Amino acid sequence: MEFVYSTRNPEVPTAYSRLDAMHTSCEILLPNLEEAVARTVTETVWNLVREADRRYNRFREDSVLSILNRTAADVAVEADEELFLILELCETFRKATGGYFDISAGSRIPDRTLVLDPRTHTVRFNRPGLWLDLGGFVKGFVLEKAVREVAGVTGCALLSFGSSSVAAIGAHPLGAPWPVSVAHPYYAGRAAHTFPLENAALSVSGKDPHGRGHIIDPVTGNTLEKEELIAVTGPSAMVAEVLSTALWAAPEGERGDILSAFDGYQAWELWCRTDGRTTVVKR
């Protein structure tokens, strides 16, 4: 974990911290706080991130998600309160997005293979070969928890989880919205587009900065190959991440209908060209 406190500008002392977790670099910027307060806030946020990584990283054999993936096809598994809440939320979002947001993998048929029992808080897979991947949900979920913690202390901060999930609390210290840029997938150091954020979140889905796709088609089970990035802004980091994932997986003709069900959210297609240009299409 890295922590730097700068008083180079005495009118706006600023704390910066970075933590590598959840397969990415998480960063936080805290202007106008005393150093001791900034350290406490930072550690609170990083504890949330570490705990989420410990619990929901499917590549950790001892995570609750890995245990669920190994056993739920054989027996109903009791889930703790937070895990069950996450699974219920993901099922709600699956239905609200026409199935294009789906945490289940290993199933190439569009039926429900995940069975949740709210009476017993148990989870069961009704067919073998199924497993769950919360990678398209947990960053937004934890980021939203972190925003609540930070906003209880300060009205000015920027949190970035891997640059693909960003939340701005208040405005930039200079008064304007925070300028948050999306990296161009073909040109290192070049922005594909910049979004002004103030009390809002941004989520971006699509190819990573190396030009690789990572989202699974919920119908076929194959990795999707698409050229565009999808950027979503709105009040909730969790919902923005769900929407960017779902809209990127959905056919272009269905994106508008999906987005219309979520008040307060906007979406853009970023068509990044190999010559460095970007065409921006608002949905």
Language model feature labels by segment:
Residues 1-283:
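Mature catalytic core of soluble alpha/beta enzymes
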